[in-house]
Amino acid sequence: MIGRIAGILLEKNPPHLLVDCNGVGYEIDVPMSTFYNLPQTGERVVLLTQQIVREDAHLLYGFLTPQERTTFRELLKITGIGARMALAVLSGMSVQELAQAVTMQDAARLTRLPGIGKKTAERLLLELKGKLGADLGALAGAASPSDHAADILNALVALGYSEKEGLAAIKNVPAGTGVSDGIKLALKALSKA
């Protein structure tokens, strides 16, 4: 399975990307939340990926954050939710907004997304309840320990720490802390653990 792609961003046409990795071009679909945060074409990009193998195609879906990929995987487990709909959900709301909607059981918020009707929204709420985890919920809204929690977590994961270790370390980073200071504080917390 392809879990990560690092290379040069050659093309970006929503929601499709073409990333050159040592002479091989990978076509990757991304949610709009990832698309809007991509570098310019010709620059280096690192994406966490989910590979889906079907009878007629091998598809790659890319994400900038571990939370987006984890949420995408949870959405795929729900009956009737395919990769396109999971991308539509992540394109229409952030992981934090989705976690908040699930926590508050807010079906109306989900029905505003394209392709999500009342029954699908209720199924999403029912099946995601408790599955997004306290970790994703901790990054939602006012409960966020740092304004840059996602960036700090990405850096820790890139340094080889697990997502769980990173989330635990981020709890030691006060709100309003910058990314580089936040990484230092999180690393300090990890060294004590």
Curated annotation (Swiss-Prot):
On whether DNA damage is a keyword of this UniProt record, the answer is yes
Residues covered by region (Flexible linker): 139-143
Q: Give the region (Domain I) as residue ranges.
A: 1-64
Supply the Pfam families for this chain. HHH_5, RuvA_C, RuvA_N
Quote the protein name from its UniProt record.
Holliday junction branch migration complex subunit RuvA
| Molecular-function annotations in GO | ATP binding; four-way junction DNA binding; four-way junction helicase activity
From which organism does this entry originate? Burkholderia vietnamiensis (strain G4 / LMG 22486) (Burkholderia cepacia (strain R1808))
Q: Which UniProt keywords apply?
A: Cytoplasm, DNA damage, DNA recombination, DNA repair, DNA-binding
Q: What does this protein do?
A: The RuvA-RuvB-RuvC complex processes Holliday junction (HJ) DNA during genetic recombination and DNA repair, while the RuvA-RuvB complex plays an important role in the rescue of blocked DNA replication forks via replication fork reversal (RFR). RuvA specifically binds to HJ cruciform DNA, conferring on it an open structure. The RuvB hexamer acts as an ATP-dependent pump, pulling dsDNA into and through the RuvAB complex. HJ branch migration allows RuvC to scan DNA until it finds its consensus sequence, where it cleaves and resolves the cruciform DNA.
